[in-house]
């Protein structure tokens, strides 16, 4: 079983990686976009980490929904709605659970990807 604490660690490590690599992400975005991806993602995940004390107290579904809403409100461009949708849909698929099986996590990720497809009309 995957504990909620493991999912919190996953988001924390992801936020650290975004922060560490924000310049590289921005440089990559400059080649095809408006050179703001790293900055926007760092801003969003910095806010997620600031909200982590209250997020960590919630069940897994509410935790993922909180991450998603934060990203929707703080990350600009196309990334905010895409990442926000991923986490919102994962939260909706999670219900009020405190731990997940690998199969349940896979189903949540699939629900998140389906949400991105719907948002992007892919």
Positions of the model-derived regions?
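N-terminal loops that bind phosphate or other acidic moieties
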Residues: 1-122
